Amino acid sequence: MRIGVDKNQLSGSHATSNAPKHRQRPDEVASLEPLRLPYGDYILIDDDVQSVLSTKLEPRKKDLIGHIKRSIDTKKDIPELWMDVTSDHERFKAELIKAKQDGAEFIVLIEDASVECLEDVFFYHRPEVVRSRFVRNKAGRLPAYIKVEHKQREIKGESLYRCMQTISTRYGVRFEFCTRRTAGKRIMELLNDG
């Protein structure tokens, strides 16, 4: 089994957070191949996708459009999903529209142990939190680092649940849930299940 992984999942901060997930698969069962995917994070490299890959030296995102049957987009937790359906909505919506126009099944896999099914999202709640961190003082004066505070907005499960229902109905998206420990195995199951 060959799995295409979006190159962004293998670089930067994603690389360290996704390393445990990528180690969950036995190497003799599945190999990961970095690709530029038009939507989602993981795809199954079947004969149709392989035909595109073998004709191009470095395939671009648009080369794979029309050849992907199922795509999995992973979210590390509920707050990341909340960000995608609120502040980062236009980018997320564009991905969903591309997948729907392409005729691909789009699955959002949320890696959060506090939620097991879509109905559990309704009861999810995270209060508003004020976080602080130290950043380098760009003015060049002392102190070298200054404390910066920012608010993380409250997440109401009821609102998120309604957004997810709308997305599911409008774009044909399927939401799946798992823990971080089982994410790699679950990705393989979802890609094989078709």
Predicted feature locations:
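Conserved catalytic cores of phosphodiester-cleaving nucleases, focusing on short active-site segments
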Residues: 70-76
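Non-catalytic C-terminal interaction segments of nucleic acid-processing enzymes
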Residues: 1-67, 80-194
